[in-house]
Regions:
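Substrate-binding surface in catalytic domains of secreted glycosidases
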Residues: 285-292, 340, 363-488
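Glycan-recognition patch characteristic of GH18 chitinases/ENGases
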Residues: 225-336
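Glycan-binding loop/region signatures in secreted carbohydrate-active enzymes
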Residues: 232-233, 317-318, 459-526, 556-562
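Primary recognition of N-terminal secretory signal peptides and signal-anchoring hydrophobic helices
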Residues: 2-197, 227-241
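Catalytic domains of carbohydrate-active enzymes, especially glycoside hydrolases
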Residues: 258-283, 341-354, 526-537
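Active-site groove signature of glycoside hydrolases
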Residues: 271, 279, 337-368, 412-427, ...
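Hydrophobic faces of well-ordered beta-strands that scaffold small-molecule active sites
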Residues: 247-251, 273-277, 308-312, 354-356, ...
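SH3/SH3-like beta-barrel fold
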Residues: 188, 200-205, 213-214
Length: 562
């Protein structure tokens, strides 16, 4: 009997041992860490030996750099997005420009710097800038690594969570021991903790790898503020900001002989300390400037204690000569020619500032426009001229006017706080309701220091007529003309608190007439908002629209007087 039992026991023991071994193998395979290494080129999304992955702060981006002559180059758009928007490329004349307070630095695309490297190269239809060149004018650090190619850009020095490895361990593509290995990290390696989870934490290494390590292998994360050691000091674009509030009035001058109307339009006007005559315009697409300025006009204005800020526009000759601001401003030589004319005219006439009123700038021409403002600011700064720039009420669709950069370069950024409803509007409405003006001021002062912001008010309104068939027409009239029309029709206006204006509506043989009036009461409401936001000034479009209602100027000057 015993002889029969022993073989059975041995068999059972063998079965148990086999099962235990199988279970052990299974458990080992399931829970032991994989040693399979990740394809690092695939991880960084690299195709070709010249591509460079970009790790921007704590993010592996989709954009790629270019490795050339052992230096890293980034596309112009990438430089704008991540590092510095002030670099400008003239694609027509093949130039790279950067504007400083007193000069615009210029180098040709493909041209070598004094240090013996190429500042900008053109490849595959794109212009690429050398990081070493960009760093001269920008506040960031970078480190370039190879095998695989990657560059780590640092532009953010906010407090981070850092930890150290308590033992040698693997950095993996994903959380889990079966995930591929990115790097084998040594005990004591410092990492930035990006996200804490239950068993695995997402971390970033100093050389740009972002992956996962087991939480148990990390010390407790601690706050750490990186040391900012870029060595960069932002230049001061100090201009000619006045030490008092600005009270500006535009004077529409369309022919040279109209300069003689200056004494008449100023009769009875009080409080104004700046007058801006519409003297200059872009004449054609070669960069010629048309001008009707008068030195005697400036002398008369100075005798009254007024500064003169000569206006230049981009629309006077748009229809007759096909003026296209982008075609002009996209050439450095044309921008330079325009600026030289304006500086020469300042010497000839003696005016005190320049007011830029470019209203036809498209999104495609945005970079060319703002570069013109930069370069003009240098010339004005050198000559002691005030530079002001006119803008539509800010909205998303006109953000390409780049208000924040205007606020750096120009002395004053003017909101043309009207045309909420204009001549081409399909529905009747206010030219400048209080809410519309307030929203414009609030948005502009988010990007431009309030002391540099001037809000312009309209001295006109629109008489709207809606016919029986629904057709809407309007005409712009001055303040007193609007009231005369209301009185003629024996109507009466009442205050509408929702728009901050007096409103009137009545019937005529032509249809329903609606008028949102601009008057002393509505202007006072707007001025109160301007005071609340501590703006740098007020402007009015335009002299003559007061229609003899001279007390309106006392209301306007109430802002600048405080």
């Amino acid at each position: 009997m015993k002889r029969k039992v022993i073989p059975v026991l041995i068999g059972l023991l063998l079965i148990v041992l086999i099962l235990a071994g199988a279970a052990g193998v299974f458990l080992f395979q399931r829970y032991s860490g994989s040693k399979e290494e990740a394809d690092l080129n695939a991880y960084f999304g690299l195709n070709g030996s010249q591509e460079v992955a970009i790790v921007w702060n704590q993010e592996l981006t989709e954009e790629k750099g270019l490795l050339q002559d052992e230096r890293c180059y980034l596309k112009l758009d990438t430089v704008h997005e991540m590092l510095n928007e002030r670099f400008y490329v003239d694609h027509n004349e093949k130039l790279l420009l950067y504007t400083l307070p007193e000069e615009t630095v210029q180098i040709g695309i493909g041209e070598q710097t004094a240090d013996g490297y190429t500042a900008a190269v053109e490849q595959d239809g794109d212009v690429w800038l050398a990081l070493d060149y960009v760093k001269q004018y920008s506040d960031f650090n970078y480190a370039l690594y190879t095998e695989p190619n990657r560059v780590v850009l640092t532009t953010n020095w906010d407090t981070l969570q850092s930890a150290e490895l308590k033992k040698n361990t693997a950095l993996r593509v994903r959380g889990g021991v079966k995930s591929e290995v990115l790097q084998n990290l040594e005990k004591g390696t410092k990492v930035t903790v990006l996200e804490e989870m239950e068993n695995w934490d997402q971390v970033q290494t100093q050389d740009g790898y972002i992956g996962y390590v087991q939480k148990k292998h990390l010390t407790d994360p601690a706050e750490e503020t990186p040391v900012k050691d870029t060595g960069y000091v932002e230049p001061d674009y100090t201009g000619n900001l006045r030490d008092h509030k600005i009270d500006l009035a535009w004077h529409q001058v369309t022919v040279e002989s109209a300069n003689s109307t200056f004494p008449g339009v100023m009769s009875g006007v009080t409080g104004v300390n700046v007058i801006s005559p519409t003297w200059y315009s872009l004449y054609d697409n070669t960069g010629v400037v048309d001008g009707i300025a008068s030195p005697s006009y400036v002398q008369q204005a100075h005798a009254l204690g007024l500064e003169v800020w000569a206006l230049i526009d981009d629309f006077t000759h748009r229809e007759d000569n096909g003026v296209d601001p982008q075609e002009i401003l996209s050439y450095t030589s044309k921008r330079t020619a325009i600026i030289e004319v304006l500086m020469s005219e300042a010497d000839r006439c003696g005016f005190d500032g320049i007011n830029v009123d470019f209203e036809k700038v498209t999104e495609d021409g945005s970079q060319d426009y703002i570069q013109f403002i930069r370069e003009l600011s240098v010339a004005c700064r050198q000559k002691g001229l005030v530079l002001s720039v006119d803008n539509y009420v800010p909205h998303n669709y006109n953000a390409h006017y780049k208000w924040a950069e205007q606020g750096v370069m120009a002395d004053y950024v003017i909101i043309m706080g009207y045309d909420e409803h204009w001549g081409g509007s399909e529905v009747a409405g206010s030219v400048a309701s209080l809410g519309y003006v307030t929203e414009g001021i609030e948005r502009m002062t988010q990007e431009v220091p309030s002391e540099k912001v001037i809000n312009a008010v309209p001295l006109y309104t629109r008489i709207w007529t809606t016919a029986e068939d629904g057709a809407v027409t309007s005409r712009a009239v001055g303040i007193q003309t609007a009231y005369d029309y209301i009185n003629k029709n024996q109507a009466a206006a009442t205050w509408d608190n929702s728009v901050g204006q007096n409103y009137v509506e009545f019937e005529t043989s032509d249809g329903t007439v609606q008028i949102w009036l601009e008057d002393e009461q509505s202007l006072e409401a707007k001025i109160n908002v301007m005071k609340e936001h501590n703006l740098g000034g007020i402007a009015a479009w335009k002299l003559g629209f007061d229609d003899g209602r001279k007390n309106i100027w006392g209301v306007i000057s109430g802002f600048a007087a405080e």
